[in-house]
Design a protein with these regions (language model features):
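Serine-hydrolase catalytic machinery in alpha/beta-hydrolase-like enzymes
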Residues: 4-101, 110-114, 118, 209-218
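Hydrophobic/aromatic beta-strand patches that form the interior of the parallel beta-sheet core
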Residues: 28, 56, 101, 127, ...
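Conserved alpha/beta-hydrolase "nucleophile elbow" surrounding the catalytic nucleophile
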Residues: 104-106
Length: 241
């Protein structure tokens, strides 16, 4: 992985292969809380680099993204970091000739939700793992109007034994909805224009499922039998180009 700089921040970049159906595509992976580009690459076991596309690993300020939750007691919120603007400029800097995909885990997943609302059309499809939509009173973006919403294919993956972000919803830096309510919310916004798919995994914790899945007692059960990267690859392959 090459470490590069955009603006005042580092990011990791792994170029895709010279040939193949996804050679012109780019995946922007947003890490979870306290992670860096290097840490999140290990945490995902580099699985998304097997999709045959380039992968970029940007870093949040103080290892957090200023996501859309109203309650976020982290330095990036204290500083008023504008990650919507930063990530929009970051994505456009690549001048991608293929499709642009966004994916995030936990805090990174919440940042994806914010981008879907405040930077509509930035991604051609998105993936969120281990994060559910905040409750309305805990969500900073204003409800989207029809002319401000861009239907975006969305794959949601959530562990049924996640101790950090419960699948039934609860309090995770403020109120959060269930995984099912999250899927229903985005289906209402997308209508028939773009699919929303929810995959729930039994005996799976706050992890990125896949071979070599990294976990701990704090994060809950690992899942090496389901490959989140492969699921996303199958999801985007079903989309019309």
């Amino acid at each position: 992985m090459d470490m590069r700089v955009f603006g005042s921040r580092r990011y990791g970049f792994v170029p895709g292969p010279a040939a193949g159906g996804h050679r012109d595509d780019l995946l922007v992976w947003l890490h979870g809380s306290t992670q860096s580009a290097t840490v999140t690459r290990r945490f995902t076991n580099r699985r998304f680099e097997h999709l045959g596309m380039s992968v970029a690993y940007p870093e949040g300020v103080a290892r957090h993204w200023n996501d859309g939750r109203r309650l976020l007691q982290e330095k990036t919120r204290e500083l008023g970091t504008n990650d919507v603007e930063y990530l929009t400029e970051f994505v456009h800097s690549f001048e991608c000739t293929g499709r642009m995909f966004g994916a995030g885990f936990s805090n990174g997943g919440h940042m994806i939700y914010r981008l879907l609302h405040e930077a509509p059309g930035l991604f051609d499809a998105a993936l969120v793992i281990a994060a559910t939509q905040p409750t309305p009173e805990n969500f900073l973006p204003t409800p989207p109007t029809a002319d401000r919403w861009r239907p975006t294919p969305l794959l949601l993956i959530h562990g049924e034994s996640d101790p950090i972000a419960p699948i039934a919803g609860g309090t995770v830096r403020g109120g959060t909805q269930s995984a099912q309510a999250t899927a229903d919310y985005y289906r209402r916004l997308n209508g028939d224009a773009a699919p929303v798919r929810l995959v729930t995994l039994p005996n799976t914790g706050h992890v990125v499922p896949g071979p070599g899945c990294v976990t701990s007692e704090f994060l809950g059960p690992a899942n090496e039998s389901v490959d989140a990267a492969k699921l996303f690859g199958q999801f985007i392959d079903e989309l019309p180009r």
